[in-house]
Amino acid sequence: MSDWNPSLYLHFSAERSRPAVELLARVPLENVEYVADLGCGPGNSTALLHQRWPAARITGIDSSPAMIAEARSALPDCQFVEADIRNWQPEQALDLIFANASLQWLPDHYELFPHLVSLLNPQGVLAVQMPDNWLEPTHVLMREVAWEQNYPDRGREPLAGVHAYYDILSEAGCEVDIWRTTYYHQMPSHQAIIDWVTATGLRPWLQDLTESEQQLFLTRYHQMLEEQYPLQENGQILLAFPRLFIVARRTE
């Protein structure tokens, strides 16, 4: 897959950072020494962690060289490592693993989440936020356009679900706080919705298409978005964006 685009990702930085702020507010830790930010991207979530615990050793992990370069430039006091989350091993047990909008890209959560818990200190916390929009029109229409135009299914898998994550983490020895929130983002146009998802959810669908194929895909996608997202009285569009939050504290 082509590398991530930090500038495009940060175009909606306020909207993308808000869930990280709200997730961090629920982390029940006062003093921490070792923190990992999994899927740190350009460092917007890492900056929040550094603000709360300026003396902590914070390591951001991301598989994108471009994102890591952006994060290193923005936060010279933090450490950043280019690595696959599934294979990365910390040098010591962690007090907090923070994963804002990253783990949804990885498979096998029944194995991944217990593995992450095993990297925590006793009483350490795994804090996770994942977009839960697989059934939202933005993502349903990606699959429909791909089917119409005879492209393979390249989208991510749906999340396991609230009850499944509760059981996975409880069985891994955690106290679990889990909730789901739907944000309604005001978008000025249907093209703005495309701009949003092009930085994230649309990437796998477009990655292997030629420029002309991408244009055909996006033209049809735009048409279908217009059918599914009506304008408000003031001309804005409300984009519903559900997100799943988990704060799991290790007790065993």
UniProtKB/Swiss-Prot annotation:
User: What Enzyme Commission number does this protein have?
Assistant: 2.1.1.144
Q: Which reaction does it catalyse?
A: trans-aconitate + S-adenosyl-L-methionine = (E)-3-(methoxycarbonyl)pent-2-enedioate + S-adenosyl-L-homocysteine
Record keyword DNA damage present: no
> Does the record bear Oxidoreductase in its keywords?
no
Cellular-component GO terms for this entry: cytoplasm
Q: Pfam families attached here? A: Methyltransf_25 (PF13649)
Q: Which branch of life, at top level? A: Bacteria
- Which SUPFAM superfamilies does the entry mention? S-adenosyl-L-methionine-dependent methyltransferases
The UniProt keywords, alphabetically, are:
Cytoplasm, Methyltransferase, S-adenosyl-L-methionine, Transferase
Name its cellular compartments: Cytoplasm
Q: What are this entry's molecular-function GO terms?
A: trans-aconitate 2-methyltransferase activity
Any GO BP annotation: methylation
Q: Which PANTHER family match?
A: TRANS-ACONITATE 2-METHYLTRANSFERASE, TRANS-ACONITATE 2-METHYLTRANSFERASE-RELATED
Q: Which family does it belong to?
A: Belongs to the methyltransferase superfamily. Tam family.
**Job description of the protein:** Catalyzes the S-adenosylmethionine monomethyl esterification of trans-aconitate.
| Protein name as annotated | Trans-aconitate 2-methyltransferase
Q: Which organism is it from?
A: Shigella flexneri
